[in-house]
């Protein structure tokens, strides 16, 4: 699987976990040169608190396009140390 945005590969791995239709990639597959810090947080009733990264590719910013659960609930333990994408990031 590959995650792309603005013409660049953001992450690539054959080891993804699908939860609620989203592919969670290993955090180690994320190309850190495209990642910027975000203070954004959200909460899921069964997964826990999500943290976010933004993407910066060729001068274009995609805020909060990457999310992860640093301490997922026991029910969501399979997504620990994994990241998922939205906001126009194509996963195929």
Language-model segment annotations:
Residues 1-92:
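Terminal leader/tail segments of proteins
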């Amino acid at each position: 699987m590959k995650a792309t945005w603005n013409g660049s590969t953001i992450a690539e791995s054959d080891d993804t976990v699908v939860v609620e239709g989203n592919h969670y990639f290993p955090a180690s597959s994320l190309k850190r040169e495209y990642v910027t810090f975000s203070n954004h947080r959200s909460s899921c009733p069964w997964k826990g608190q999500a943290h976010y990264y933004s993407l910066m590719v060729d001068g274009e910013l995609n805020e909060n396009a990457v999310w992860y659960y640093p301490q997922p609930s026991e029910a969501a333990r399979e997504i620990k140390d994994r990241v998922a994408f939205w906001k126009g990031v194509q996963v195929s």
